Amino acid sequence: MNAFTRDDFVTWMEQLARRPWPMTLDAFTDLAPELGWHFTGYQYSFTADFAAGTRKVVVIDNKAGDVHTISFVLAKPALEGVELLAELNDFFSSYVAAASETWGPPIRTVQGRNPVAAWALPQACIAEITRNEEKIHAKFLTPQGARFY
């Protein structure tokens, strides 16, 4: 799976932050084709055509029906062992640097085996990345999701 470039990560988070939140899941489903995203027919599941390739995107709503979280994989190298971890660490560091250059220092970081970094975005949104042993995952929280962060 091709990885997002650091600039593509920032661009997508900013593009999502500029959407007119709050927005219901139904309204988001109608808007998704403008982003190059397509509803799969399964609850919360979209496919997205990013520069890095097609990805599954999960869009979750709250009890009121408003979207609160959008998540997708940024990088999942086809490597193993030490090479995989080194590649993931390089990508993670690159995403952290790009986000920090754009939005300032992270509002939250977690060090260790599964590091996390999160930034405050315009319109009271949050961008978060998490690295585990296989991939780097991006999470965008709308204002409806960010208020519980």
Locations of regions flagged by a protein language model:
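Short helix/turn-capping signatures at newly exposed starts of structured segments
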Residues: 1-113, 120-126, 130-149
